[in-house]
Amino acid sequence: GVIYLTGNLLLLPRLGAALTVVITVTGQIIMGVIIDTFGLLGAHQQSFTLFKGVGIIFLITGIIFMNYVRRHPVNRHKNTPIVFWLLIGFVFGFAPPIQTTINSTLAQHTHSSIFASLISFSVGTIALFILTLVFNRSLKISSTHKTLGKIKSIYFIGGILGMAFVTSNIILMPFLGAALTTIIAMMGQMIMGIIIDHFGLLGSPKNKITSRKLGGLLCIAIGIILLRLF
């Protein structure tokens, strides 16, 4: 989890938000299918079929429709090693399905999804604490920002939402498999992202829903059906 979140922060200024989402989610889908197909990390093995392959194509197409924004010609030449960063983003995308599978197996050993989440977050917290001391060299936080003003209390609930997300993935993994669990969670993220953008919630700029985004959602829904039923 720490690798994925920190990796996104590294990729955002180099690839932009849209391309970062596209490449990391593609990595998530591919790794989820690999885990299910070969039964890795204690996951229940599921055979790979032609329908699943077509479903993956629909999913990736939908993700691109919903997130990809054409890069400006001027910026295209500034980031020369973009292929390198795309490859890094693809590899970072492997982390969530691996995390979900490991946490689900851990939950089976500990007989508790909540306790497995606690272990996962504790290890992640220690890792982030060390990274903060190494790179930030300070644990101080200012309650106000020069341009953004005072920090609202709602911005501190991210940890609670993360706990709910990780725990629900642990519970769903044995029933849906790594690939489908990742895809369902991803679709929920995208739908909520569209709602937040459309209404400008939580201080984000408004970005209206377009026919391209709706078409992307439809492609993703078709992909999920193909992966689930076949």
Task: Give the positions of each predicted feature.
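Transmembrane alpha-helices of multi-pass small-molecule transport proteins
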Residues: 1-3, 58, 116-139
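Hydrophobic alpha-helical transmembrane segments of multi-pass membrane transport proteins
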Residues: 1-14, 95, 131, 141-176
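Hydrophobic alpha-helical transmembrane segments in multi-pass integral membrane proteins
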Residues: 33-43, 93-102, 161-173, 220-230
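Alpha-helical transmembrane segments of compact multi-pass small-molecule transporters, enriched
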Residues: 23-38, 123, 127, 184-199, ...
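Glycine-/small-residue-enriched transmembrane alpha-helix faces in small-molecule transporters
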Residues: 7, 33, 50-51, 78-114, ...
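Structural motif at transmembrane-helix junctions in multi-pass transporters
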Residues: 7-23, 108-112, 168-184, 207
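Loop-to-transmembrane alpha-helix entry segments
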Residues: 41-65, 175, 199-223
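Membrane-interface interhelical linkers
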Residues: 15, 44-50, 68-85, 105, ...
